[in-house]
């Protein structure tokens, strides 16, 4: 959920129209949370139909496998980066930020707007660590 929130803010700061939706699959009992995020000039619905997703970012390999049906023909599945991510983050709680760093290299959003979005969400709470991990995900060690 935090990852979709940060991505949404980064897109807003870039000047895009943003719609976001979350589907909670018994998350309070350890189930998955599926977030859909769309941005562009004019976005009318937050839900993305099966076979139309441009980027799939999953934080568990099993979830990536289950959600693969959502990917479009030209879609990019970032699930394969999970192994690298787990080696690069100091704690699992930073995995989503690392994955956002990877995703950010594909999207038309300036790095400054990603950083601004991270600051918007985290304020002072682990802000330096989150920025560092985000930059590692981008392949830019700070």
Put a short name on every predicted segment.
Residues 1-142:
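Active-site cofactor/cluster-binding pocket
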């Amino acid at each position: 959920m935090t990852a979709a929130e940060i991505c949404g803010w980064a897109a807003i700061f870039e000047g895009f129209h943003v719609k976001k939706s979350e589907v909670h699959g018994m998350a309070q009992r350890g189930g998955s949370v599926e977030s859909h995020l769309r941005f562009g000039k004019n976005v009318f619905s937050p839900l993305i139909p099966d076979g139309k997703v441009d980027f799939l970012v999953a934080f568990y390999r099993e979830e990536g496998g289950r959600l693969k049906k959502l990917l479009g023909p030209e879609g990019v599945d970032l699930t394969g980066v999970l192994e690298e991510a787990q080696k690069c983050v100091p704690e699992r709680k930073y995995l989503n930020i690392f994955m956002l760093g990877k995703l950010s290299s594909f999207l038309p959003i300036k790095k400054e707007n990603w950083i601004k979005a991270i600051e918007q969400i985290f304020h002072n709470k682990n802000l330096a660590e989150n920025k560092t991990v985000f930059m590692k995900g981008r392949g830019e060690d700070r």
